[in-house]
Amino acid sequence: MESFAFAYKLKNNNQNNKVPHTHEAECHINVWKVDVGTILPKTKLYFDFGLMINSNIEWIYAYIPFDFEENGRDFDLVKKLQNNNQLLCTVFNCDYRIQMGQGDTFGKVMDKEDNIKFSLHQLGSTKFEIIPFYKTGSKKDIVGKLLKIHIQEVPQDTEKVYIRFRIEPLKTTDIVKSEHISNDFLQAAFSRIDMYDLRINEIRNINTDVMDKIKGDNYIPFKFDKVHLFYMADTKENVANGSSLKQDSRLLEKDLWATYLPENCYKRNYIAHHWKKRVKKEDMRIIEESIIETKQLFIPFDDYRIFFTTVYPNIQIVRLFVYLCIVVLLGWCGSMLSFRLSNFLPHSIPECFKLLIVAGMFFVIIVFMIVTSYHLIIKLIRK
């Protein structure tokens, strides 16, 4: 899959200033894999994007490398955070409270000491525009969409602004590579493996038309000081990390996340698998002779990439039917090859000799099982 891309443009009164290209953003991405519906539930993917940006940014480009729908009421997640203070604290894992101002557009988020941490910014239908990008030589096949987001004038005492929105991919095949488990003949009928390779601001994997649009409109790709990615899935799903980033997992609290889940989502236990990227650097300074002070600094980085696989229950009726056909055919072949021992042995051989032949076969099978399981038997005896 192509890379996601996030870029920004400063306010007009800041464009001519010599502002370094280091307006770092903090990026949050939640990937939800949920079952929607009651009688015949259907598995769907949802992507939540959150950006913590400087207040002197006026425009944001967010390129999504697949076709999606904005999801109507569920698009702007800031509304959910403004209406539920407990949910706000849960999402940011801090003890915050919100103070509304300037209508419903902004809400100041404050800590216990009443210090303003940042402002939540709602995204109404007039605050963003969707620009589709098509496959080369086609005017129907959409390969991605560019969200052009307008940040309104923020309160003067606010340094940081936070936006958060949710989208639903129209086709999951554009994002996930799915295969059956090829190294296990039987398990392949009951399980499936999905592969996710998600990238953010990886220049060489961004659509060239999108990069031309970003550069042509004088937007600057974000640098990041921190990126969080969460993959929310059913407890029966096994996630394997394929990245150098550390993975940690926890069980989501049903009562805290109930109002945040996608609409019509089947309520069940979900596990949040988390990957965080933050680049550290040690700064060493000599204070006096033989005295060195070491300070740990966090430096901005350009891109983010994560790869992981998931294995989950998935009964494949066609594959099971094929397996059943194989068993029936083998039984039919066996019955065709069956014969009576009397067809080959003279009738003078007593029945007890035939019994010895059958017993010998069982003896060979038992010996074979013991020999092949020798190491396992030794371990059991030692225990």
Please provide the spans of the model-predicted regions.
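Beta-strand elements of well-folded, non-transmembrane domains
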Residues: 51-55, 68-70, 167-173, 233-235, ...
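A surface-exposed beta-strand-loop module
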Residues: 115-186, 266-292
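Ordered hydrophobic segments in well-structured contexts
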Residues: 5-7, 44-50, 61-63, 148, ...
